[in-house]
Amino acid sequence: MQLNVKNETSTLKAVVLGQPGSIGKVPTLEETYDAKSYESVLHNVYPHEEDIFREMKCFESILLKYGVQVYRPWTLENCNQVFARDVGFVIDDKIIVSNIIPNREDEKEAYEVVYNQIAYHKIFNLPEKAHVEGGDVVLYNNIVFVGLYTQPDYPQMKTARTNKYAFAFLKEICPGKIFIPLELKKHNTDPRAGILHLDCTFMPVGKSHAIIYRDGFMHSQDYHTLLDLFGRENVFEITREEMYHMHTNVFSISPRVVVSEKSFTRLNTFMEEEWGMTVERVPYHEISKMGGLLRCSTLPLIREND
């Protein structure tokens, strides 16, 4: 397999979609590792496996409709494998195997079905102290945006997934790219007060547009960096409540086609009427209760150079 992913929106040819089967029991509050799951367990609204399966089936059907080759990881018993993005990610023709949080290490073995098709020298394992998850890595052609957390309480912050060591390592293995760090606000138990991954506060769509939640960044200058790059006229800003429901976490099949949650009325209408995009609406509300949405569920392997 010849990997090729340079951005978030070029025409998708091959992707890994997470696995909804055998997710195991509902975690306790202590076992949750993101604020949205914490809230779902606290309020007894954590999703049922059959609902997760149904929603992912709808997403898969849209991918297949557009001729995308869909890979699935092996099913591991009693293991939540919905969010493929965090296990690995592709930059150009390289796949980086994430050093994910210890609670999720078992998930990586299920991706052998993909790794076995990739040349060994294109698979990169990070040094032990370099932590990164794919949700914090957003591609925009020659630019790689990386969501970071560099504060002293990093070891205590369950929702801090990517550190400065990973940022340095990625720069080393992709020397032709421009890397831009964006520091995120974090909170372990309040999903309205912190950002789990960069793709929960920022996402490029189309050729030159972006969806942004400005208050997700620890430093206001990071928001202005994005605004300067894309242009205010090309940015759709979401509210705190829309961020909570993960409006930035849409997934592009091409520069013209984006998959979005069906309840994102304001965003979906804007993308269609103002940006002229085709919006494929799917139900994904139950999955969102576990702290991720559409982009989180995918690991793109091949996109065209369009």
Show which residues each predicted segment covers.
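The feature marks the mature, well-folded catalytic cores of soluble enzymes
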Residues: 1-306
